[in-house]
């Protein structure tokens, strides 16, 4: 959510 890496939360 910070820079568009919401998919990297895992």
Curated annotation (Swiss-Prot):
Modified residues (Phenylalanine amide): 10
Keywords: Amidation, Neuropeptide, Secreted
Nucleotidyltransferase is among the record's keywords: no
GO cellular component: extracellular region
The organism's place on the tree of life at top rank: Eukaryota
UniProt-annotated location(s): Secreted
Any single biological process term in GO: neuropeptide signaling pathway
Family to which this protein belongs: Belongs to the FARP (FMRFamide related peptide) family.
Name under which the protein is recorded: FMRFamide-like neuropeptide SAQGQDFMRF-amide
Species: Delia radicum
């Amino acid at each position: 959510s910070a820079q568009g890496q919401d998919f990297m939360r895992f």
